[in-house]
Amino acid sequence: MKKILLFIICFANFLFAEPRLEFDQTALDEYVHSIDESFEYKLIKTISGEGYKTYIVDLTSQSYLTKNDIDRTEWKHWLIIVSPDVIKHQTGMLVIGAGDNDGKIPQGPDQLSVEYAKATNSVVASLGMVPNQPLTFSGESEPRWEDAIIAYTWDKYFTTGEDRWPLRMAMTKSAVAAMDAIQLIIEDMNGTKIEKFVVSGASKRGWTTWTTGGVDDRVEAIIPVVIDVLNLEPSFEHHWSAYGFWAPAIQDYVDMEIMDWWGTKEMESLFELVDPFNVKERYQMPKLLVNAAGDQFFIPTSSQFYFDELPGEKYLRYVPNADHNVAEGTDALQTILAFYASILNKVPRPEFSWELSEDGSIEVISKSQVKEVMMWSATNEKARDFRKDTIGNSWVAENLKQNEDGLYIARPSMPKEGWKAYFVEMTYETPFGLDLKLTTPVRVTPDTLPFEYKRPEKQKKGFLSNLN
């Protein structure tokens, strides 16, 4: 323990994180890479398991805001590191997770981290309490959680212009601090140097996965999960045009009247800070985007607003009959493990391409040997709404055969009423005994939007518009 505490003193002002100086630096870069005297970690417990050890770490990633703004400024996290007895890779995995700051010491690792670490002979760590929560802001009596915190901090940014406010800044810094701590602890405990990371997280943590990859050169690949919302403004407008309302899942943003800022200079300024699409040139690394076809937050056709413009190696996996809790009752975690193993072992990912034809069909051609190709489809006769909450487990699969031109063509029948959503799923075998499932984007027929989104007639005024 003394040796670990010595590292806290020595490295509080010398972290492994390196800014990506090949790009123009943003306020997010500056926030993440600024020295924070609060950074420290303490090894609370070491647990020996069959073929692995677990390190339970009390991590302080930073100080966020001031005591005049918020009830707790120090961000505390439980960082749980699973280290297999034999480490074969200098790349590890960081999973950014949620949780609340209840002070309870974790009793051990989650089973998934153990399985991933032992299956890949690599270090797998989970970072909790991203964001720290609940948080109570000055002038409010009730604590906020999750999206309610994000929405509040967006509103504060719109009115003040202070880039210390958006919660994504602190969430990103917490992930960077976790990578620092992992490197220090693993090298100290067994002499292994972890040089790179594959970063993953779901929902708000999926967004943080993007921003972490954008600011830290240690990130070798990213796996953002259920955050199908890059290029936010057209994505959200598409959301309303499909539903005619804002889905209940994003009510926290409605309550803070965030949508009334659409089209303003303040909203544009925020997107420059926190929307990965605005710095898409940074994402040359391999990317697996895992989304739920029945997500209650995001429209399944949202990838049309960003995917084609992303550079480098990129893959989609839309999971049928899944909602925002995409792992429940699905094989999504197997896809993530197969992709992670391919990065560790430098196994090339499958090569394939698709074309979204004018007649509504999806044409797929695969250079790599494919095990199975399926078209998944679901129909809603009443609305362009494919949330699992609305249609249940309505997605059905149909096997596709390769034609004489080497193409797999998905051409669903037009629904008698309503709308039909569909996509193509390719299953590839891997050397690891795991199937890797990848998909095309989701299409909808008829490709019509039942509602017309209109921006608020009276837009809000903030730190930029008030200057006029």
Model-derived segments and their meaning:
Residues 158-203, 219:
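Gly/Ser-rich "nucleophile elbow"/oxyanion-hole loop immediately N-terminal to the catalytic nucleophile
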Residues 416-431:
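Short, aromatic- and glycine-rich surface loops/edge beta-strands on solvent-exposed regions
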Residues 18-89:
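Catalytic-loop region of hydrolases
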Residues 98-103, 114, 122-176, 229-242:
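Cap/lid segment of the alpha/beta-hydrolase catalytic domain
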Residues 296-302, 328:
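Conserved alpha/beta-hydrolase "acid-adjacent" motif
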Residues 338-377, 393-406, 411-412:
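Surface beta-strand/loop "capping" patches
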Residues 283, 289-291:
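Short beta-strand/loop motif that positions the catalytic acidic residue
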Residues 211-260, 317-320, 326-331:
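Hydrolase active-site cap/lid region
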